[in-house]
């Protein structure tokens, strides 16, 4: 794959699982339950990329398989987690070599992009990653739920556990999909992925409930009870009434827990379900970063033929991406230098993420100095092509 002298990058052998576990324990603060969950349910040596120096593994990362729904198309991608180096071998450039090898590998596997949740975004920007999705966090007193009523007619709240979960996976998927339909980009969840989410929640000592009204599944909630706080990891419903009804369940814990912290998709405006918005603290944080590996494939996915724009992209890591992309009656690429290229706009590979996912509007990108537009008359046209959009990804591994 990649080797220079005594350095070698490869996927792990079956016998190296213990090494992977040690790396994880040395680098992250996860509990024994969380580590056990990961290595029992998700870890796969075929996705564990390691860098060896003198036959010793000194740096590693995990590439976990996911299917993105990106502009209504199912796309295979990798969620990069557990990026770490041997504590005694840091600052030797191992991590950089490993990340670049991962990007090159993923591109060879025909993946248009990969994604990760950074501990420090500054590190990953150097490799062309940029944010493309936010999460909203709402903090409020449990008493704010006092007016949220239980359903009137025939209803049931069912706690989902290891024994009964298979009965409810399809209904969880239906509620999830109904919430995703307006998102430009989200992770597809089938039975396997929902099962993983429930196991992960359980390893984090969380509970999951689903609300039925009559025979219809209307909402679900995944939450944990910690000290004086109720942490809601995910709460999705078919409509705002069902949303309030599933939150009414949480009010039942009011004698023991004082505050609620609720995570929600971007632009969900949950504060307006409450009577007093000023009592609801809302914090919006960037959550997930993407790295575009193949701009041509993305422009085709976005169906940008006949847009009649020319975009010059600069990629300092995967240099073969640098060049002119012409979105005419067909989408073409030419690796000419910037001096020779005639283009409408210039952008680097990281900021391209903002553009293609609609994280920012064109006007925002101009204000932030993230895009260089040669011809100002084209801004109106660009605003039509690259509109602002929402994405939802709230996975941890």
Regions found by a protein language model. Give the residues of each.
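Hydrophobic pocket-lining residues that define ligand/cofactor binding sites across diverse proteins
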Residues: 89, 106-107, 250
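Intrinsically disordered, low-complexity, positively biased terminal segments
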Residues: 2-5, 18, 156-397
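Short amphipathic alpha-helix that is part of the acyltransferase structural core
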Residues: 3-60, 64-65, 72-79, 146-191, ...
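Conserved active-site alpha-helix within GNAT-family acetyltransferase domains
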Residues: 108-112, 118-136, 267-283
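Conserved catalytic-core motifs of GNAT/GCN5-like acyltransferases
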Residues: 68, 117, 130-147
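Conserved acetyl-CoA pyrophosphate-binding loop and the N-cap/start of the following alpha-helix
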Residues: 89-101, 111, 241-245
């Amino acid at each position: 794959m990649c080797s220079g002298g005594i350095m070698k990058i490869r996927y792990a052998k079956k016998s190296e699982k213990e090494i992977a576990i040690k790396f994880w324990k040395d680098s992250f603060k996860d509990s024994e339950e969380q580590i056990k969950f990961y290595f029992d349910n998700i870890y796969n040596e075929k996705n564990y990329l390691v860098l060896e120096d003198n036959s010793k593994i000194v740096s590693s990362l995990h590439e976990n398989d996911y299917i993105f729904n990106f502009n209504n198309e199912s796309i295979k991608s990798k969620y990069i987690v557990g990026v770490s180096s041997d504590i005694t071998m840091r600052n030797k450039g191992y991590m950089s070599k490993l990340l670049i090898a991962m990007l090159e590998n993923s591109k060879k596997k025909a993946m248009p992009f990969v994604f990760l949740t950074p501990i420090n975004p500054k590190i990953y920007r150097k490799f062309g990653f940029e944010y493309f999705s936010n999460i909203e966090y709402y903090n409020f007193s449990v008493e704010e739920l006092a007016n949220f009523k239980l359903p009137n007619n025939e209803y049931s709240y069912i706690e989902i556990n290891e024994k009964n979960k298979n009965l409810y996976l399809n209904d969880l998927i239906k509620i999830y999909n109904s919430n995703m339909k307006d998102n430009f980009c989200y992770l597809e969840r089938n039975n396997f992925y929902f099962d993983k989410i429930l196991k992960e929640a359980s390893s984090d000592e969380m509970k999951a409930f689903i609300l039925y009204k009559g025979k219809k599944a209307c909402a679900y909630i995944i939450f944990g009870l910690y000290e004086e706080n109720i942490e809601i990891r995910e709460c999705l419903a078919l409509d705002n009434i069902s949303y309030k009804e599933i939150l009414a369940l949480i009010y039942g814990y009011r004698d023991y827990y004082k505050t609620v912290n609720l995570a929600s998709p971007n632009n969900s405006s949950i504060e307006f379900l409450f009577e007093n918005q000023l009592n609801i603290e809302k914090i919006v944080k960037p959550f997930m970063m993407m790295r575009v590996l193949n701009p041509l494939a993305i422009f085709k996915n976005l169906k940008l033929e006949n847009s009649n724009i020319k975009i010059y992209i600069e990629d300092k890591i995967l240099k073969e991406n640098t060049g002119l992309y012409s979105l005419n009656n067909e989408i073409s690429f030419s690796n000419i230098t910037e001096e020779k290229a005639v283009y409408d706009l210039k952008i680097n590979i990281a900021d391209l993420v903002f553009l293609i996912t609609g994280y920012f509007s064109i006007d925002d990108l101009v204000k932030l100095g993230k895009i260089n537009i040669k011809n100002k008359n084209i801004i109106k046209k660009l605003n039509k092509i690259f509109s602002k959009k929402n994405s939802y990804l709230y996975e941890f591994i």
